[in-house]
Structures are given as C-alpha cells and as structure tokens.
Amino acid sequence: MTEPRVELQQFAEHMERKLTKRDAYGGWRHLPLPYLKESLKNEINELLVALEYESPGEVMDEAVDCANFCMFIWDVMRSTTDERKGLVRRNSKEEVHGKS
C-alpha cells in the first residue's frame, strides 16, 4: 500500500483531534444508524451555512465533523456486514451501470 497523501494525513489528524475531545462519550458504535444519518444531515447543513457565512477555518471544522459522521456510519456498517449479507440492495452500482 502506498503512503496516504499529505492532505489526507492532515485531514485525518484533524478528525482524530475532534474525536479525542469526545472520548468520554463512549464512541459511536452504540449509536443507532437513524441517529447517525440524522446527525450527518445536520452536519452537512452546518457545513453549507459555514461555506456561505463563516471563515475558512470554520468551514474546515465543519467538513471534519461531516467526515467523522461518515466514518461512524462506515464503521457501524462494516461491523454489521455479516448480519446484512442476505439483504437485497436496490439501485446498486451494478444495476445502475448494467453489470447485473
């Protein structure tokens, strides 16, 4: 595997800094998926507002919040993959691109 790009490393460091500040809350794996989805929507809205009205630093901060919630969802889905294997996916990439 190649080394992550400098920008990715810097972004991940910002993600980790924010996560570390909230370690006392016990992580995200216990959070229900609907809560994570709604929280991601809220963070995206905050990012959109920041893009219009806030400083670059605030925009970057909101982008990190969005990324952290995306990572939470990714991690929760990864941990439930075995439970979800039998599910039928609608509009999968394969169906959309004619590779069924």
Question: What is the predicted role of each segment?
Answer:
Residues 1-100:
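Flexible "arm" and connector segments at domain edges
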